[in-house]
Amino acid sequence: STAKTDTYTADTDTAYVYSGNELNTYGFTAHDNLILGKQRIAFGFDNNNEVSEITSFKARGEIKAPYQPRFRNTAWGIFLQSNLKLFKEKLDLSVGLRYDYIDFKLRKTPGLENEEKSESYNTFNPNIGAKYNIYGGMAVHASFGTAFSMTDAYQKAGEFLYSGTLTVGNPDLDPEKSRTLDAGLTFSRPELGVNFDFTYFYTWNDDLIVEEAWTDEESGQKYKTFKNADKAKKSGMEIMASYDFGRLFDSDFALKLYGNLTWMFTYQDQTKGVWNKTLSVRKQNANFGLDFLHQKGFSARLNGRFAGHRIEKNFIGDKYRPTLNDLLSESQPGYLTDKLIKHPQFMVFDFSASCPLIKNVSVGLNINNLFDENYTEKDGYNMPGRNFQVRAAMTF
């Protein structure tokens, strides 16, 4: 796939592109299953590539240094996942392992005059999960797994000058790692239309990447690099439940009332030995709604989404919202002192419906943000208000 973004200086006939960014992603996956009785083993490998093309201009046709160099990331992965049924199929056991090799390559970038550099690293990530079926649809489950977040190419191998600061990559930089443990209880009776699950989870994050800056006392040159320093921890619960009212009548349709809730108990990160609440994390997130599906093909869904408060850094308040600080001094004085802002909670509803016209042809309607809620997912970027989409589909 290709994503291309051109940012213009203004919305006029004389405007020009001052920042152009193109990101190309491609790859493949090859996998197979080995079935031995009721035991199943999946294995395979995959490849993912990202190629960035970025160019910045200070005048029409005059190149300037972009905020980061062009790069190419290549990742190869090998995985093995087994799903075993033991003790007369009362115990479902899943054990897996994944190995990833990632290669970074920074490319020469107009305006930065940086040299081409490359770095690489590899990582192993195991996982194990178990589910024990007790009786009558009741089961307990638990799992443990590790994961990683790939570093940016310039954090690992960069060396370029931008806005007077020399950025130097750290070849010893490790990817951010996480370990997650969860356990819970589930009850499922499809013939009764009932499904319920409760899960408690705890996640540890290690080797979070932070910036490290200093100034050379003799030359006055500013430097910036990256290191693994911080930690984080998150814990909470997830509840999912649904009931199909269609089971009370006949099997011609399903009318499912559903809901799921994530409630965070802990969300903290450690910087220089001090634990603070992690920014941009909501304490509550919930989805709920009503789903209708008829055997003749008509379907409809009303979905609601609730998002709790979130706290972010107040990057744009002084420049674009000069009157906001006066309001914050009255309502959020503690956050104003720390240059933070607490965003309000919101609830958004969406509606969709689809109906078959003739064989293999259907039409549908989406109404997003049904009640025209004004909300943001990121400060300064308000999400679209009420909008409509009409679609038609033909299957072969």
Model segments located where?
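Transmembrane beta-strands of outer-membrane beta-barrel pores
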Residues: 2-4, 36, 47-53, 97-105, ...
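Face-selective signature of the C-terminal outer-membrane beta-barrel domain
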Residues: 1-110, 120, 197-200, 236-243, ...
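Conserved C-terminal beta-signal and adjacent last beta-strands/turns
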Residues: 80-83, 131, 142, 175-180, ...
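Hydrophobic, lipid-facing positions within transmembrane beta-strands of outer-membrane proteins
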Residues: 24-30, 74-80, 124-128, 140, ...
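Structural signature of Gram-negative outer-membrane beta-barrels, strongest in the C-terminal barrel
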Residues: 38-42, 46, 66-203, 291, ...
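Extracellular loop and loop/strand-boundary signature of outer-membrane beta-barrel proteins
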Residues: 11-20, 27, 60-69, 107-117, ...
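Gram-negative outer-membrane beta-barrel transporters
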Residues: 88-93, 200-205, 221-316
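Membrane-embedded beta-barrel scaffold of Gram-negative outer-membrane proteins
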Residues: 1-11, 49, 53-56, 133, ...
